[in-house]
Regions:
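Short inter-helical turns and helix N-cap capping residues of alpha-solenoid HEAT/ARM repeat scaffolds
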Residues: 16-17, 47-48, 78-79, 109-110, ...
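Helix-adjacent hinge/juxtasegments
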Residues: 56, 61-88
């Protein structure tokens, strides 16, 4: 298994194709372990936005708390796909005060980011997200409104 992880790390770090690097990030998110985690955190600086998105999502899958601060930096990135991936990953990672980090995304100009934020807030089981999720139920984008509705259902269940 170590050889396979090493091969994916090598591909992530040196493949010329951004798709190959992104695939490697996704695979490393399945394996975990310290070497994979270190490579994924490093990949957050890849020149390709596609690779950075894949690395962020993989770190979320791994619940990599050590990546929280780097992922939080993506929440203000000009690229909506990076903001959304960071929101999803941070929702999976959780932690103290994570809702307060994600709540400003309620007003993001990108519907995809607002939807990702709604999903993430629904995973955190934090009552402080209730008002924002209630407002997002009225979002003009139906996907965002649906994500907020589903998040509220999860939040209510977690608080019982």
């Amino acid at each position: 298994m170590d050889e396979e992880i090493d091969a994916w790390i090598s591909q992530l770090q040196s493949a010329h194709s951004e798709d190959a690097r992104a695939d490697a990030a996704e695979e490393l998110g399945e394996f975990g372990g310290a070497p994979a985690l270190a490579a994924l955190i490093e990949a957050l600086s890849d020149p390709s936005g596609t690779v950075r998105v894949s690395a962020a999502l993989a770190l979320g899958e791994l619940r990599a708390a050590s990546a929280s601060s780097a992922l939080q930096g993506f929440l203000t990135n000009p690229q909506p796909n990076l903001r959304g991936a960071a929101a999803v990953a941070l929702g999976q990672i959780g932690g103290p005060n994570m809702s307060s980090v994600l709540l400003p995304l309620e007003n993001d100009p990108s519907a995809a980011v607002r939807g990702a934020a709604a999903w993430a807030l629904g995973t955190l089981a934090d009552p402080s997200a209730y008002d924002a999720l209630t407002r997002l139920q009225s979002d003009p984008d139906l996907d965002v409104a649906d994500a907020a509705q589903e998040a509220l259902v999860r939040l209510r269940k977690s608080l019982r």
